[in-house]
């Protein structure tokens, strides 16, 4: 009986020691790279879905080089020629199938959940890209991009639900 009592006390003490630490919370880190499509062909103002012009094709290749050392897990693009063509060089280089999204109906929380612990490239437009970034960071920080500006890179990192962001600008000395 004395042995059983000692054994129970020992098990109880070991149990208390095992409960000393609070459970560890797994770190989650998701990084999103937002860009606007590269320069589009403006030769036909009636064309609502133009392709990229020569400079835009160069910039699309430039983005692929900039993102070369980033282990991109997913690429999203709107369903337009200019955004698809901007995403294509990076998608080919990384062997990733581009997924399409509708900026008007995307569920931001679901998008975050679907891409937890991933590095994601998102290609959008002058109005949708800053809006998407604002929704991801939970504040109205960025305004619509000027229609002639195609070199902004917004990086949003979400660590354990807390978002940080930065906007970088890249020049492209691509031929016209």
Question: For each predicted feature, which ranges?
Answer:
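Short, linear, compositionally biased motifs with a strong N-terminal bias
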Residues: 10-13
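C-terminal motif of bacterial Sec signal peptides marking the signal peptidase cleavage site
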Residues: 15-18
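Generic beta-sheet signal
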Residues: 32, 116-124
């Amino acid at each position: 009986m004395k042995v059983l009592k000692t054994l129970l006390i020992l098990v109880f003490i070991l149990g208390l020691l095992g409960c000393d630490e609070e459970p560890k919370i797994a770190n989650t880190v998701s990084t999103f790279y937002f860009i606007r499509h590269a320069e589009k062909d403006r030769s036909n103002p009636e064309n609502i879905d133009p392709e990229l012009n020569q400079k835009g094709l160069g910039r699309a290749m430039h983005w692929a080089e900039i993102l070369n050392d980033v282990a991109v897990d997913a690429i999203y693009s709107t369903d337009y020629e200019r955004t698809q063509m901007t995403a294509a060089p990076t998608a080919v280089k990384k062997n990733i199938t581009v997924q399409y999204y509708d900026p008007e109906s995307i569920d931001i929380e679901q998008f975050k959940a679907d891409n937890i612990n991933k590095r994601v490239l998102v290609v959008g437009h002058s109005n949708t890209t800053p809006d998407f970034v604002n929704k991801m960071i939970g504040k109205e920080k960025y305004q619509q991009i000027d229609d002639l500006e195609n070199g902004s890179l917004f990086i949003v990192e979400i660590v354990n639900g807390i978002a940080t962001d930065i906007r970088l600008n890249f020049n492209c000395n691509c031929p016209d």
